[in-house]
Amino acid sequence: MWLTYSPDGCTVYLTPGISYYGPPAHACQYCGAQFWHQERVKRSYSGEGGCIRFHLCCRGGKVVLPFQRDPPQFLAGLLDPHDDVLSKYFIKSIRSYNSMFAFTLLGAKIDTGINKEPGPYVFKINGQVHHRIGSLLPDEGKPPVYAQLYIFDTENEIQNRMSIFDRDRECDKDNGVDKKIVEGLVRMFDESNELVKSFRAARDLLGGSQVQPLRLRLLHDRSKEAPQYSAPAGSEIAGLIVGDFSEDKKSPDVIIQDRGGGLRRISNLHANYMALQYPILFPYGEQGFKLGIKYNRSGTLRVGVRGEVTMLEYYAFRLQQRRYEATTLIRGGRLFQQYIVDAYASVEENRLRYIVKNNKI
């Protein structure tokens, strides 16, 4: 038996068999997110002017963020399951391909046993999640990994990236990887991804001279004078530091050493936190959540005392499906599941951080 509701939401029926609500036939009047009728604000079915309202996406127009751009043509073809056989293999192994191009290491205890039983794929973690990044160059005698692959031994970059498939236990070895896809992704990121361009600039400087030491600074935030929602340029994402440098321990920027230093954790409040871990989902190196995103104050919208978008509100907006927004995220399959779990873990950590900081006991 299934519970179903009348169109006005007031009457409940017990219906035998399968319940089918059809496609999401409603859209938020502010951001265009698509919803089912049952997801509306309950008191709005006969609200002002008969307008049905939804708050799960943008809090009634308070949260305004840039829509995702259409992905580069190569990635768009790979994410289309009806395109060709190659795209189907890509979607099955999408987490493996993402691991090959990720700048950071995902630190989490992943429960692999849950998928040994029949049923749909589930991405489950236990405990805390964090992203870590190493040096620009590998230690002597060790192969390059993660961000180092954009800088070290790039003449053999394809081979180096595919060798990760054999070393990384998180790679889906049942489906394999295709060299043509890896080559295409390398070209695509070189042309489109601002983070990749910053690391390539470090490569060129390291390869063209013996200047030491060299560091790459990943900027936590853009200039306060920059338009809030404009696309970031490379100079707003990262900067190269040549010579001696005294690091400010209080700075939220991430300073990547040329060699050594071990793995360094990146704060989930850093604007590039997700783009560094999920280049497949953010092919242009788009910035993510950061502190200080203001609520929309246009029109008659009432804004509370806080006045800023929370991390939960940011991800609630980002995860919606909209008719006029690119579907790169929601076409990500298993990688999209991982991103959602990662985002929720960040939200929970941020809540705990607030409790600890504001504990008056």
Predicted features by range, described:
Residues 1-361:
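Non-catalytic interaction regions
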